[in-house]
């Protein structure tokens, strides 16, 4: 039992399958439209003229999106507590599934926000697919290797899982942040291009 163990989540019955589908897939995908309204209408220029910096803008987007997933997940927690009290489940198993849902929601939401910073719909889809592929390619081998070292989901595994969540959440937000620049000098490479390259080579 461990965080980011997707197989554990989707093999734990219909409740966790539905919770994972809603909180890790459907709600985070709403982030694909979040940055577009700021960039296409020029609102980001007004925001950057205030005391807000680029990190504040993208973090606010993520907290809003992730907060909706958390609120939705919390609303169904009484069912989990009821299952635990009647003795049908183990608390560590439920905690691992909950951590997978919340951590996965943060990573997918950050990737969706990063992809939404591109104006073209095809580019958004392509960037999001690249982000998901990089996330799977970067997280899965590290998690499997750490689980193999400790012969299970121990402390090393969970430290690796927390690092993976933090890494890919920050990469998604950095991608969105890179598109909020007011100007780029003619000899500079676009920061978003460098971050896309980072996604390619990150695994």
Predicted feature descriptions by range:
Residues 1-43, 54-203:
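Hydrophobic alpha-helical transmembrane segments of membrane proteins
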